[in-house]
């Protein structure tokens, strides 16, 4: 729905505060005089499983249901126009006609790929259509839910779903739901008719009694959540009369269950508190929401025997929610006899430091492996360096917990949001022919199937589907399409178009995927055997690792080559004098030398697998271990590592204790470098003991252990506490030289308040020509004296300034002027003729980096001649893009030659529209 911008209705509130550091996940216990619990024995730690839950799955992701049953006509359950039903098979943004019965009929087709688990896009009842005019779109994707208890009538009934699950189970396939906890359909509106995001710092939540509070202080569920009413929110929520009871369960109809802060800007705080293009963003810090979502999905576990969940928009929900929700769902599933219940989350980031905490702290079993996807595309499609793959796998230790590790990561090459692997191949090599693209596609599949993780086939990729881009352009139906935008899409390995159904089991990619699945099934080490890196070319070329079966001691050498030539590489294996015979991609036989090295040749854009003729030799020397603790005083996610000598196929189990609390198993590392992570609370009291233990176990079952500990030192500068921000209009400082602004000293001066400058509230800088600051006032305050000073303590003006807060809670001041202005001044009009993009690189090197622009750019660029920065500033490079008259969006890509800063197209829009959320 096109958003109409509204002006915020703001209460006058004098109390103003500053946000400090946030609390971490689990508060540690301070050291006591009592004897702390003894560490677990070596034998107990040695029994810790090296693998957990699902590590040998192969997923098939169905977004639009696979088959349209009967003739091309609307489902019988729907009546009305396309804007009422959402059904229009000629429009890619509407329902096309597939349903659960059609998917059930195609189970054998799915099984033929080697599939062990079906992941279905959300099938719960949705709001059929959102938006108007050209912005109208249907909820065919399933992410605009109104009823979390019923199957959407476009897809069928709850009975149809039970039948599908039953038949899939009978064929040996699991079924996973795609679930949402972040938001619901767009039902809640705001009285102000304004949708810009309002931050917590400027507009804190208020209790029913009008006191500001920070909801994050209550998110862990340990404290009673404050009582609130309709006046507690930055935006005043309202629900149309006709929709007051639309949502199911009924608690979802309470507007107080939502954040009510306006539309997300997709960055910073708004990424977790803002509405995604108007979708109602649930207040997941509330215990009612946590408990409500637990009950919703527990019902599906119990009544439908579902095998697991793919969880949408995980990084847009607070971490405390996941810790509680995932723990509760795991416990409930186990209670129902489902010890292998598996949950993986969508954390849309190629940075392992962003994705991994949702496993280690959020307690999910896995995440969708966006870092792998990014590196796999760079290697297989763009001919990038093997070192990028090495870096991704080198971070695998970050996912290790007592119940999970990177072998459970869910790997993929493309999806319903970013686009298909076939699309990326065509984008990365626009002049390439079908044969070359098909070869690169095969290489990408080999990389995904032969490396650690659970691979996902996005429906249609096995038939060579491509597409014009992501989102709607990546959601073609498998049955014959009537959508014009799909009919001209190429399909790799065939001359077929989307005017025909695509269920060809003889298609080249279908046959390749099926063969790779058989290879993994016959050789389980290729699915979840120990993965040890052996070689990574610095540039295009060979990437190699070993996959070793810890039970049989059999080693497999796996090598890939993304170059157009046929190079060779020499690297170590686990055995000296061992013969390795070609198993896949080659008939060659190689033998390792006395130094355990082999030389392997890999054909152009291909992969090979060689299998050892015998077991690894029994270890001669017993293992020894040396443990390395995090630096004293380190907080947050810290690393614990161990050096191991001797043994063979060693694995190291780590455990930690904070204060006098229980010992916790941190997880198992099954190859060097042996590392795990530990979360240390930022508020750990000084003097708290941090104790660590690690046990190494070799292939013969022999063990050795190491222990160490240290005391947490006092924090320099004292402790910080998260404080609530203000609600109301701030003191505004209109400045000609914002960079010179320093702290603002506010409040009635008292002789004993000899504050340091660093403790004064700094000015925040939200927009053009203004900055603002807040400070909490005493109850009953009537006047506020303040100074504006720079970093050296120099005053902005000689005289003290005073605000009469009984008259106003908002004033404007200008540099060098003593006068306070109580009426909002005129601000310079925004320049609508150009877009300004600020780009920052960690290395600070912008040589060769340019901006490719299209869409509403006045002068779209050629890829070979990108727009150059007009200047650099303390943040980074600055690009200025002239826009067309009335411009509403700009598409862009930052790149250096063929190296892209991000793998997918980026876009800016002047106003959000009601397309599906970023999930």
Curated annotation (Swiss-Prot):
One annotated GO biological process: carbohydrate metabolic process
Gene3D superfamilies: 2.60.40.1110, Glycosidases (3.20.20.80), Golgi alpha-mannosidase II (2.60.40.1180), Immunoglobulins (2.60.40.10)
Reactions performed catalytically: Endohydrolysis of (1->4)-alpha-D-glucosidic linkages in polysaccharides containing three or more (1->4)-alpha-linked D-glucose units
A GO MF term: metal ion binding
Entry-linked SUPFAM superfamilies: (Trans)glycosidases, Glycosyl hydrolase domain, Starch-binding domain-like
Site positions for Transition state stabilizer: 417
EC number: 3.2.1.1
Signal peptide segment: 1-33
Protein name: Alpha-amylase
